[in-house]
Amino acid sequence: MPGWSCLVTGAGGFLGQRIIHLLVQEKDLEEVRLLDKVFRPETREEFFKLQTKTKVTVLEGDILDAQCLRRACQGISVVIHTAAAIDVWGIIPRQTIIDINVKGTLNLLEACVQASVPAFIYTSSIDVAGPNSYKEIVLNGHEEQQHESTWSDPYPYSKMMAEKAVLAANGSFLKNGGTLHTCALRPMYIYGEKSSILSGIMIRAIKNNGILKVTGKFSTVNPVYVSNAAWAHILAARGLQDPKKSPNIQGQFYYISDDTPHQSYDDLNNTLSKKWGLRPDSSWRPPVALLYWLGFLLELVNFLLRPVYNYQPPFTRYLVTISNTVFTFSYKKAQRDLGYEPLVGWEEARENTSEWIGSLVEQHKGTLNTKAQ
């Protein structure tokens, strides 16, 4: 694949930035284009420093702007589509999430057809597979099993619809007579340095006398470190351009995990932060069944008040379910088809993330609430 080029949407995001750092190390990559709605000045500066043999072009534009996408796709070999509205808390309006995640993806697929981009990699989510019940148990699930979310909540619904559109587009004819080849990656919960979710959890704990809020003590999951999730995208980009590997990858989806130990979300947060004196809340926690039905009542209040007031429930049945379910998946198919092996081991991933959390503690320790003696 001599002289290839790549467009990454959502390039200013948590995963997107890590993909860029790996992409610029790729042999024969002539240009990487970075597209996001807006880039922070420090992110722009960081990307500017990556200019070496690979041309780095920073573009600001809206995923809903079809003309912008067509311009961004001109002369591109591979599109990696990570841009998404990520919200499992019910903060972003439903239609906004669906527009960005579904309509935006359809716009980008059409731009690829018009600009004759032959390869498209979609960053999907484990949420498209479920879980659909907190009683559901999936251990080392795989792609041959039928796991599909039945939730109507906008995030899992929109990601599932977008993934289906991407996989259905495989084999589409391009304007130049070529063929579009697509695949989708379903990362587990992604953790690591610069995670906005982890940052929020840790900063709230710092402001709460170092107490971590307990939200997922009944879960068993296998999170994936951000560099490993990014690495899978690089391998997918290579694979779709490899005449020998591509036929096995086209139209396929892959679960992306690594060797992070299977554990609860709360245990992960505790493991990553205990070095800095943060600790889990030891107070009584209602059983999951009670939380689930409380979530239903809160959703009912939201529905009844919607005509006059935008009430945001503190949690929903969906959030209770995904936070308290046994739901782990194997990466063997990605290993077989993409040649995927985790780039970073658990020990290094844990240390990197923990040190970053330490910097957050140092940065925010002035806001640490202390109990009266």
Curated annotation (Swiss-Prot):
Pfam families for the chain: 3Beta_HSD (PF01073)
Pathway membership: Lipid metabolism; steroid biosynthesis
Native source organism of the sequence: Mesocricetus auratus
Membrane-topology descriptor: Single-pass membrane protein
Gene: HSD3B2
Residue stretches spanning the membrane: 288-308
Binding site for NAD(+): K159
Name of protein: 3 beta-hydroxysteroid dehydrogenase/Delta 5-->4-isomerase type 2
Free-text tissue specificity from the UniProt record: High levels in adrenal gland, kidney and male liver. Low levels in female liver.
Catalysed reaction equations from the record: a 3beta-hydroxy-Delta(5)-steroid + NAD(+) = a 3-oxo-Delta(5)-steroid + NADH + H(+); a 3-oxo-Delta(5)-steroid = a 3-oxo-Delta(4)-steroid; pregnenolone + NAD(+) = pregn-5-ene-3,20-dione + NADH + H(+); pregn-5-ene-3,20-dione = progesterone
Superkingdom assignment: Eukaryota
Signal peptide region: none
PANTHER family per UniProt: BIFUNCTIONAL POLYMYXIN RESISTANCE PROTEIN ARNA, SHORT CHAIN DEHYDROGENASE_REDUCTASE FAMILY 42E, MEMBER 2
